Amino acid sequence: MLKKFRDLTLEDIKAKRLSLKKEYMDLRFKAVVGHVENPLKKRELRRDIARLNTIVHEYEIGIRKV
């Protein structure tokens, strides 16, 4: 999954991060209200968001070039 993220442009990474955050919030809401089919999905989403945050930070500090 990480290789797939690293091939994206900065704008695509930010868009993907936003969509994953929305999906994570929806999943959290479903967990509070009722039953979640795959409870491990929350962990996977949280880790993917962290990976994307790391890549964005690499762009910001200059480790990764645009």
Curated annotation (Swiss-Prot):
Annotated keywords: Ribonucleoprotein, Ribosomal protein
Cellular component per GO, a single term: ribonucleoprotein complex
UniProt-recorded name of the protein: Large ribosomal subunit protein uL29
GO MF: structural constituent of ribosome
Gene3D superfamilies: 1.10.287.310
Pfam families for this protein: Ribosomal_L29
Similarity-based family: Belongs to the universal ribosomal protein uL29 family.
InterPro entries (alphabetical): Ribosomal_uL29, Ribosomal_uL29_sf
Organism field: Borrelia turicatae (strain 91E135)
Classification lineage: Bacteria, Pseudomonadati, Spirochaetota, Spirochaetia, Spirochaetales
GO biological process: translation
Entries under HAMAP family matching the protein: Ribosomal_uL29
